[in-house]
Amino acid sequence: MANTMQFDLVSPERLLASLQVSAVQIPGADGDMTAMPDHAPTITTLRPGVLKVEGPEGTSEYLVTGGFAQIGADSLSVLAEKAIPVTEVTRAHLDELIAEARSSHEAAKGQEHTSVVDDAAKLLADMEALGTHMGL
């Protein structure tokens, strides 16, 4: 059993991380999960949350707003809609994300399908909870 796996975190703007890691905690849409070496092959969608990476330099965290994670036995690739290292997140970043979520929620209220409204409301609640979790 290998002790590490390749981890890549990519957003539309840039490659944020590419390194060997021992574990990554993923905010999955169906619940949090931890990817480790020799994990069963899995693809999951992400919900807004904090991605925690345990690498050789210690632990690093990234704020993600959604996307996909592809887990394999020896690698994990995360394609994030938006991703920001937690150390770089400011109140302005968070306010922008909350404003986008609020706008999506308002737009969804006109939809006939309640699931669209519910999803938008959940996104807004997740964004506001992230600010509290991060102390912003």
Curated annotation (Swiss-Prot):
<comment type="subunit">
    <text>F-type ATPases have 2 components, CF(1) - the catalytic core - and CF(0) - the membrane proton channel. CF(1) has five subunits: alpha(3), beta(3), gamma(1), delta(1), epsilon(1). CF(0) has three main subunits: a, b and c.</text>
</comment>
<keyword id="KW-0066">ATP synthesis</keyword>
<dbReference type="GO" id="GO:0005524">
    <property type="term" value="F:ATP binding"/>
</dbReference>
<keyword id="KW-1003">Cell membrane</keyword>
<dbReference type="Pfam" id="PF02823">
    <property type="entry name" value="ATP-synt_DE_N"/>
</dbReference>
<dbReference type="InterPro" id="IPR036771">
    <property type="entry name" value="ATPsynth_dsu/esu_N"/>
</dbReference>
<dbReference type="InterPro" id="IPR001469">
    <property type="entry name" value="ATP_synth_F1_dsu/esu"/>
</dbReference>
<keyword id="KW-0813">Transport</keyword>
<keyword id="KW-0375">Hydrogen ion transport</keyword>
<keyword id="KW-0139">CF(1)</keyword>
<comment type="function">
    <text>Produces ATP from ADP in the presence of a proton gradient across the membrane.</text>
</comment>
<dbReference type="InterPro" id="IPR020546">
    <property type="entry name" value="ATP_synth_F1_dsu/esu_N"/>
</dbReference>
<keyword id="KW-0406">Ion transport</keyword>
<dbReference type="GO" id="GO:0045259">
    <property type="term" value="C:proton-transporting ATP synthase complex"/>
</dbReference>
<comment type="similarity">
    <text>Belongs to the ATPase epsilon chain family.</text>
</comment>
<keyword id="KW-0997">Cell inner membrane</keyword>
<dbReference type="GO" id="GO:0046933">
    <property type="term" value="F:proton-transporting ATP synthase activity, rotational mechanism"/>
</dbReference>
<dbReference type="GO" id="GO:0005886">
    <property type="term" value="C:plasma membrane"/>
</dbReference>
<keyword id="KW-0472">Membrane</keyword>
<protein>
    <recommendedName>
        <fullName>ATP synthase epsilon chain</fullName>
    </recommendedName>
</protein>
